[in-house]
Amino acid sequence: MQEYHIHNLDCPDCASKLERDLNELDYVKKAQINFSTSKLFLDTSDFEKVKAFIKQNEPHLSLSFKEATEKPLSFTPLIITIMVFLGAILILHLNPSPLIEKAMFFVLALVYLVSGKDVILGAFRGLRKGQFFDENALMLIATIAAFFVGAYEESVSIMVFYSAGEFLQKLAVSRSKKSLKALVDVAPNLAYLKKGDELVSVAPEDLRVNDIVVVKVGEKVPVDGVVVKGESLLDERALSGESMPVNVSENSKVLGGSLNLKAVLEIQVEKMYKDSSIAKVVDLVQQATNEKSETEKFITKFSRYYTPSVLFIALMIAVLPPLFSMGSFDEWIYRGLVALMVSCPCALVISVPLGYFGGVGAASRKGILMKGVHVLEVLTQAKSIAFDKTGTLTKGVFKVTDIVPQNGHSKEEVLHYASCSQLLSTHPIALSIQKACEEMLKDDKHQHDIKNYEEVSGMGVKAQCHTDLIIAGNEKMLDQFHIAHSPSKENGTIVHVAFNQTYVGYIVISDEIKDDAIECLRDLKVQGIENFCILSGDRKSATESIAQTLGCEYHASLLPEEKTSVFKTFKERYKAPAIFVGDGINDAPTLASADVGIGMGKGSELSKQSADIVITNDSLNSLVKVLAIAKKTKSIIWQNILFALGIKAVFIVLGLMGVASLWEAVFGDVGVTLLALANSMRAMRA
């Protein structure tokens, strides 16, 4: 579907009606409007006809491919209108002479027309299309009817305060939209393309693969690429949530959206902007807010019946009692108008999507990206969670946990020999040994003269350090060189070490459990998760050790299809939605089959594509945060629904009893909408 920006769309109910009208057109396959971001997603065979339809039915709206600069809303006209209105009322009551009454009548009529301009025009547009239940038409009918029953001061006051409420509603919506735009603004706006000795300013979208771009200090990398010249530090916080800068030099891969902190870089473009990391982050957030939750779908359908129902009730209040001699028509029409004032479903229609929008926005600022708002609803119902082990519950970073010397050698010697043999290796196991050697022995690797270095695939390394031959690897490596050695029973990866054909001992290397893993599971229990399980392709001993530490059940040595099958059984056992958290390629099928699949940001691209939620900062505590956000968002939305319906029901009853006035009924409509909007904004701070 093609994406368009809709300008001047400031009414949520109008957005729903326009979406419905567009979907009824023969030449439109699908139309979807995101009121929160003012975007139209359109699949049509005739775009010009769509434009003409919108121009005819909503002439104040316009479409464009690019977002227009938003004009700031001005309080001045509103304040002047209110001041003139209050001044006229004050003069009228202080000096109620016939001349003053006539003069103030014309002033109030002018105030009515000025403040109600949008309502009056909108009402006539709606009536022309046969939309008799349009909120503008109902407001116009209510104020005119109030005028004819002698309540012309209240008629004008309703229009003034309704318009004031609409203005404040626009302001609140505008601010919420800016919150999303603040997230989108992490994407770079410009790129400096190198053409010979010149730099040309272009949009990142216009860059092509193999182009060379120059990124100065303080600027953002426009697209994913590789450094061809220069060395610097990059801040990748916008992509991963990590605050630690990353050092890059020639041949280093860099991500679009990263901030250059230290020196000028020349980067060769590897991906088009639409395929870059930052574009995917922005797209994920926007796609999430485009989707409608089940609650929102229900409210949209409910609102279509709500307005006619309230209008019917108001009509019955106005007509039936006088027919049975229970009072005058003027009295009961006035009471019916009070009920009519609360017929607009705006508080419901706008607060639900903005509540979810706030939840998605709050999550994104914490490094949690959602692919749809439906996951917020499902998360609140989940009772079970299963984890992959390596890279999810563990750091995926190897660490020396034990050194076992043999044949009279010391731990220090075993570690020193192993480190010497692996100085030229970049394998994670080799790096963990080098790190341990630096920490324990303060060994200076630059003093070692390494010769004849050889990596034996799947087994280990062989290297000559000065005049000594060192071999480090698994049992197969030692067997190949006919070196006798002792068997090991420890859990983890074993690196055997031989020095000049003599076995000196072995090193145990284990993956570390994440620092926040235990705390995460404890906090998840507080959030209502009752059942925990580890599903791993690793061997039983390694998985069992982690499971015992965390206190949860486990299944080990699983193939990808077995992992999916075991997860399905785990989920069915507890008869409630279940979450799966993983990061590897073998996790993708299970992530896709889970009620909510959560992919860790440093995992494989396939796992992130299969997940409903991507945690960019790789922190397990983000699981706790996203559950808390989901629950708070749901709570806020249902507060809005119950509050709006409750207040409106109260005013219908008060109108029937003749207790409430039209002034007070304005609060039942506009006031409730504003309070619901303000409450929805709390989700942004979840």
UniProtKB/Swiss-Prot annotation:
Q: What is the effect of changing residue 504 to I?
A: In strain: 69A
Which Pfam family would be a valid example here? Answer: Hydrolase
Domain HMA span(s) in chain numbering: 1-62
Residues engaged in binding Mg(2+):
583, 587
Q: What PROSITE patterns does its record include? A: ATPASE_E1_E2 (PS00154), HMA_1 (PS01047), HMA_2 (PS50846)
Q: Which residues lie on this side of the membrane: Extracellular?
A: 93-102, 152-154, 328-332, 658-665
Topological domain ranges for the Cytoplasmic compartment: 1-72, 125-131, 175-308, 351-635, 682-686
Please give one Gene Ontology molecular function term for this protein: ATP binding
Q: What is the effect of changing residue 209 to I?
A: In strain: 69A
State the InterPro entries in the record: ATPase_P-typ_cyto_dom_N (IPR023299), ATPase_P-typ_P_site (IPR018303), ATPase_P-typ_TM_dom_sf (IPR023298), ATPase_P-typ_transduc_dom_A_sf (IPR008250), Cation_Transport_ATPase_IB (IPR051014), HAD-like_sf (IPR036412), HAD_sf (IPR023214), Heavy-metal-associated_CS (IPR017969)
Alphabetically ordered keywords of this record: ATP-binding, Cadmium, Cell membrane, Cobalt, Magnesium, Membrane, Metal-binding, Nucleotide-binding, Phosphoprotein, Translocase, Transmembrane, Transmembrane helix, Zinc
The processes (GO biological process) annotated in the record are: metal ion transport; transmembrane transport
* Function summary: Couples the hydrolysis of ATP with the transport of cadmium, zinc and cobalt out of the cell. This ion efflux may influence the activity of urease, which is essential for the survival of the bacterium in the gastric environment.
| Family named by the database record | Belongs to the cation transport ATPase (P-type) (TC 3.A.3) family. Type IB subfamily.
**Protein's recorded name:** Cadmium, zinc and cobalt-transporting ATPase
GN (gene name): cadA
